[in-house]
Design a protein with these regions (language model features):
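N-proximal low-complexity "stem/linker" segments adjacent to membrane-targeting elements
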Residues: 1-34, 38-41
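Active-site-proximal specificity loops/subdomain of glycosyltransferases
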Residues: 3, 17, 51-98, 103-119
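Short loop->beta transition adjacent to catalytic acidic/histidine clusters or analogous donor-positioning motifs
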Residues: 19-22, 41-51, 66
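Short His-Asn-centered micro-motif
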Residues: 25-29, 51-53, 98-99, 131-132
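Short acidic, S/G/P-rich loop/turn micro-motifs used as interaction or catalytic elements
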Residues: 29-31, 102-107, 136
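Short acidic/polar active-site loop segments enriched in Thr and Asp
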Residues: 46-47, 93, 127
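Catalytic-site signature of metal-activated, phosphate-bearing donor transferases
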Residues: 108-180
């Protein structure tokens, strides 16, 4: 389905977005759009909504779960505006968001789809679960001019790290991390 704007999607949401969870993909440029959408397709999302400029070309697909919305994702507050509008329209739905060339990983994602992860969360009475969004940078930009390498990916130079989260008194909280 192709929507000309966010209000058109919202108006149709009760009919077309009844199956969750829903992945929101902000497509800023042409880098790894196909692989990002394919990656999300392996997790059994009920719907995948790609937000992108009207002149952007998306991969041809027969997928009934992929929707396109024409939207300027580079505008100030684009992501919060989109997310808040959809949360208001579908308050009981679980949403995940990412940008193109970002890849979702969560515990046991190699063998469990996102619905199974959410079932686990519900059984455990959890409101959230630790997951990672990973940029897979290329070491050799001559060989990979788009900056992405699926085979020998590297983290960026500043790195990513986790520090123990502390309470107001400075005491480390069990099993809680601040990821930077």
């Amino acid at each position: 389905m192709h929507y000309p704007n966010l209000p058109a999607l919202i108006a149709d949401s009760k009919r077309t977005l009844t199956k969750g969870p829903i992945a929101l993909v902000m497509i800023e440029d042409d880098v790894e759009v196909d692989s990002t959408l394919s990656h999300l397709g392996t997790f059994d999302f009920g719907n995948i909504i790609a937000f992108c400029a009207p002149d952007r070309t998306l991969p041809q697909t027969s997928s009934e779960v992929l929707h396109r919305v024409d939207y300027d994702v580079t505008a100030d507050n684009a992501l919060p505006d989109i997310a808040n509008a959809l949360i208001k329209a579908l308050p009981d739905m679980w949403f995940y968001y990412c940008y193109n060339a970002e890849y979702l990983y969560y515990p046991f994602c190699e063998h469990r789809n996102v619905r199974e992860m959410l079932g686990f969360m519900q059984e455990e009475r959890r409101d959230s679960i630790m997951s990672y969004i990973v940029d897979i940078y290329a070491r050799d930009l001559t060989a990979h001019p788009n900056g992405v390498d699926h085979v020998t990916a590297h983290f960026d130079k500043s790195g990513y790290y986790a520090l123990a989260r502390k309470d107001a008194a400075g005491v480390e909280l069990e099993r809680q991390l601040d990821i930077s």
